[in-house]
Amino acid sequence: MAVAQTVEDFLAKHGIDYTLVSHPHTGSSHETAEAAHVNEDHIAKAVIVKDTGGYAMVVVPAGNWVEIEHLRKELRRDFHLATENQLAELFSDCEAGAVPPLGPAYGLETFLDRALSSLANVYFEAGDHEKLIHTSGEDFRTLLGGVRHGYYSHDN
């Protein structure tokens, strides 16, 4: 699979330069970091949550866990993790589990962990389990312009 069409269109719309990093098929963020020879802290991972208001995306470093209780308290919303079936519906142009952390591209409210706010380079899922998109941290933050920033995760 190539880059998910939604992602490709979103990058083009914003005039973002990027490179693709190919790696052997992986099943987790940790495996992806090892296979691509990239520090986990530089890979942005998407976690999809849901409440009565709909879906939202939390973008955190790949080696971190989302602090769901903290998210609930800070935002005063009753979030829980979305199911695999729900993810398949939301990200129909992506392989299961290979969710690109570009909530605005998919029309999702997005929360960006501050741990990703000052990186010079960011890597993220292209929509399959064999490619990462590499872009500058500045361009990544441009793609997520206007999203809420906070501390939403902790180290794994």
Mark where each language-model region is.
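Extended, low-hydrophobicity, polar/charged segments
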Residues: 1-156
